[in-house]
C-alpha cells in the first residue's frame, strides 16, 4: 500500500457508494425488444384487469366533477360520491357505471402500457450498484423519468381521454334533457373531429398531460421508489407482501398528486365549443383554475379525491400485482 492509499483509506467506501458505474451490471433483464414487448403486453393486460374492477368509481368521480358546474348554476348542494352512484344506477341503470369502457381499453393500449415501458427505458442509464451490490436509483431520477414518461404517453392518448369523458357524462346530459351527443366511441371521434377538426382532439391536453405526469410520478415512480425503500429498511424480499405495500403507497401518492389536475382536465374536456371550435366556458387551464377557486372555492380542486383514491388505490394494487405476476411467470425479475 503506497502513501496515498494509507492516508486516504477511510474515504474509499464513500467513493464506491457515491460513484455510479455505467452501464449497470446488476440488471437481471437486459433491455431488449423482446423484454420491452413483454412489458408492454403485461401492462396492457394488467391495466384492463384492474380497470374492469374499478371503472365504475372512475365514472362516478367524473360525474361528481362535472356535476359541480350544474350545481353551481342551480344553487344546489354538491353531489356526494354515494348519491352520484345511487342516482346513476336508479335513473340510468347498471350499465351506466361502465359508460366509456371501450374508450378506456383503447386508451390503456396507448397510455398505461407506454408510460411504464418509457419509464423502464428512461431509468436504465441511472441504475447503478453500491458497495453492497444493491441496485440503486436516485429518488429525483425516478421522479424525473416517471414525470417525462407520463407526459409523452398522455400526449398521444389524449383523444381517447376526451371520448371517455364524454361517454361517461352522456347519461347525465340525457337526464337533463340535452340532445344526444355520444352513441359510440367511433361516433364520438367523428363528431369531435367534425365540430373542431384535428386540434379538438387535443383539447385540454395541458391539464391532461399535467395530471398524467403527476399520476405517473405518484404511481410508477413511487412504486419503484417504495419497493427499493422497503427492501432496504424492512428487509423485505421480492414477493407479494413487498408488492402489495408498495402498490398501496403508489395509489395514495398518485391520488393526492393528480386530483387537482384531474378536476381541471374534466372541466376543460367536457365544456362545449362554438361553431369555430372555441371553448365557451374556460379559455385555458389557468382560467379554469381561477374561475373554480373564485366561484366554488379552493377545495373544489380536490372534488372527487376520495373516489379517486378508492379507484387508484385498488387499481394500483391490482395493476402492479398482475404485472409482477406475469413477469414472474415469464421468468423475469421484479419490476
From Swiss-Prot:
Recorded hits in Pfam families, A to Z, give: Mito_carr (PF00153)
State the Gene Ontology BP annotations: response to cold
Report the domain of life of the source organism. Eukaryota
Q: What happens when the gene is disrupted?
A: RNAi-mediated knockdown is adult lethal at low temperatures. At 15 degrees Celsius there is a severe reduction in the number of larvae and flies do not survive to the adult stage. Second instar larvae moved from 23 to 14 degrees Celsius show no heat production in response to the decrease in temperature. In second instar larvae body wall preparations, maximal oxygen consumption rate (i.e.
Q: Name one GO molecular function term.
A: transmembrane transporter activity
Which SUPFAM superfamilies has this protein been placed in? Mitochondrial carrier
PROSITE patterns, alphabetized: SOLCAR (PS50920)
Q: According to its record, how does it sit in the membrane?
A: Multi-pass membrane protein
Q: Which residues cross the membrane?
A: 40-57, 100-118, 138-157, 204-223, 244-264, 304-323
GO cellular component terms given for this protein: mitochondrial inner membrane
Q: Where in the cell is it found?
A: Mitochondrion inner membrane
Kindly state which keywords UniProt assigns to this record, in alphabetical order: Membrane, Mitochondrion, Mitochondrion inner membrane, Repeat, Transmembrane, Transmembrane helix, Transport
Where would you say this protein principally sits, based on its record?
mitochondrion
Which regions are annotated as Solcar repeats? 34-125, 137-229, 238-329
- Name the family the entry cites: Belongs to the mitochondrial carrier (TC 2.A.29) family.
- What is its biological role? Mitochondrial protein that is likely to be responsible for thermogenic respiration. Likely to function in mitochondrial uncoupling i.e. creating mitochondrial proton leaks across the inner mitochondrial membrane and can therefore dissipate the mitochondrial proton gradient and convert the energy of substrate oxidation into heat instead of ATP. Involved in cold tolerance, it is required for development to the adult stage at low temperatures.
Q: What is this protein called?
A: Mitochondrial uncoupling protein 4C
Q: Which gene encodes it?
A: Ucp4C
